[in-house]
Amino acid sequence: MALWGGRFTQQADQQFKYFNDSLRFDYRLALQDIDGSIGWAKAIHSVGIINQAELVELIAALKQLRAEVAPNLAIVLQEDAEDIHSWVELQLIKKVGDLGKKLHTGRSRNDQVAVDMKLWCKAQVLSLQESIRALQEKLVETAEANQLSVMPGYTHLQRAQPITFAHWCMAYYEMLERDYSRLTDAYKRMNTCPLGSGALAGTAYAIDRDLLAQDLGFETATRNSLDSVSDRDHVLELLAAASISMMHLSRFAEDLIIFNSGESHFVELSDRVTSGSSLMPQKKNPDACELVRGKTGRVFGALSGLLATLKGLPLAYNKDMQEDKEGIFDAIETWQACVNISALVLEDIKVDTERTKEAAQQGYANATELADYLVAKGIPFREAHHIVGEAVVYAISQKKALEELNLDKFKQFHSVINDDVYPILSLDSCLTKRCAKGGVNLERVAEAIAAAKQNLNQ
């Protein structure tokens, strides 16, 4: 039974009914819809629409319904209804009879779905932040165990300068910290309650909306009824946060795919997060990482899709806005799964420290140190840069590392070069010199790890 049949003389075509109905996906809002209905029952009691006995009966029935639904939201789908709001009201009427028909007084599905979505988004923020913290803890744990694991750092996928695996881990810790704070910021803006805004012009009853907001766990009520039922910024912000974070996770996955390859062999991923080939017995494929990378596009698509949906909508509510749900439900489920699987990938990861060190010693990753050495000897950096470039070209032609060139050959590039150049070209020196805050110096990395642990323990 629809909630709006009085105006119509014909029943909806079954094809349209399926096209229009949303219960098959918005059933996920069952708990939020029930919670909002409990809050609304208290609100209409406060202005005399229902008496105390009716309030008690309504709340008891709604709480009973919540207890029935909470263990498995999908039980909602066992019965037919247009949407989750209709389903909850119909179940309530079954429990309390005509009293259930009073609950919707002064309320529209427009403000009802708006509050449901905000309640749902708020709950997702808290759950996602918990998962992000768990992944950060794994990154810090892995960093702490690999502070001496020297490896090449890359630009343009070319060896650039030596770093440590710990420094690499902490780079992703920082990205996730921004993801965490982005959710915190979004939560502040979604922490306003639209219930009581009616269809668009506000409710006709003198309800204390700020009290209603606080009862539902919001900081305050929204300020404009027209905006309240039209607003989906909270969904967009959550999708934007998800998209940025998924981009970070995809880069994390891509790095590990490269590090795990036979050509790099910097890390070995556990059997628990890899799979084999149906044809090639030797294969051990990084499927967990590849799926994180692959699923990123789904989340990006949800954001761009909703932006396109909302961009041309006149105020206030339009049925187009029903399209906010499937994308956000899938995107958040995907994001949560990718955060969790990324933490699992780190649990048993093995770093081949001999191989990473060997790679760090190749590719002339110490060339910048030679340029800095020349600068310390009074050579302008741009000139030093050119000199070192010539030295690298020569070393490549001789199939030698820079530190393998003899002093006479170094002096052919510039006379200021002396024996003291050789210690400068060592991996230890390369790391030690990067001692400014945020650098790869071992003490700075240890400080970053300590600060991260303190932050995670707060």
Curated annotation (Swiss-Prot):
Principal place of residence: cytoplasm
Q: Name one GO cellular component term.
A: cytosol
Which InterPro entries does the record cross-reference, listed alphabetically? Arg_succ_lyase_C (IPR029419), Argininosuccinate_lyase (IPR009049), Fumarase/histidase_N (IPR024083), Fumarate_lyase_CS (IPR020557), Fumarate_lyase_fam (IPR000362), Fumarate_lyase_N (IPR022761), L-Aspartase-like (IPR008948)
Q: One of this protein's Pfam families, by short name?
A: Lyase_1
Q: Where in the cell is it found?
A: Cytoplasm
SUPFAM superfamilies cross-referenced by the UniProt entry: L-aspartase-like
Query: Could you tell me one molecular function GO term of this UniProt entry?
Result: argininosuccinate lyase activity
One example of a Gene Ontology biological process annotation = L-arginine biosynthetic process
Q: Which pathway, metabolic or otherwise, does it act in?
A: Amino-acid biosynthesis; L-arginine biosynthesis; L-arginine from L-ornithine and carbamoyl phosphate: step 3/3
Q: Does the keyword Transmembrane helix apply?
A: no
Does the keyword Oxidoreductase feature in the UniProt annotation?
Answer: no
Question: Which reaction is recorded as catalysed by this protein?
Answer: 2-(N(omega)-L-arginino)succinate = fumarate + L-arginine
Q: Which UniProt keywords apply?
A: Amino-acid biosynthesis, Arginine biosynthesis, Cytoplasm, Lyase
EC numbers listed for it are 4.3.2.1
| Family, per entry | Belongs to the lyase 1 family. Argininosuccinate lyase subfamily.
Q: What is this protein called?
A: Argininosuccinate lyase
Q: Which organism is it from?
A: Glaesserella parasuis serovar 5 (strain SH0165) (Haemophilus parasuis)
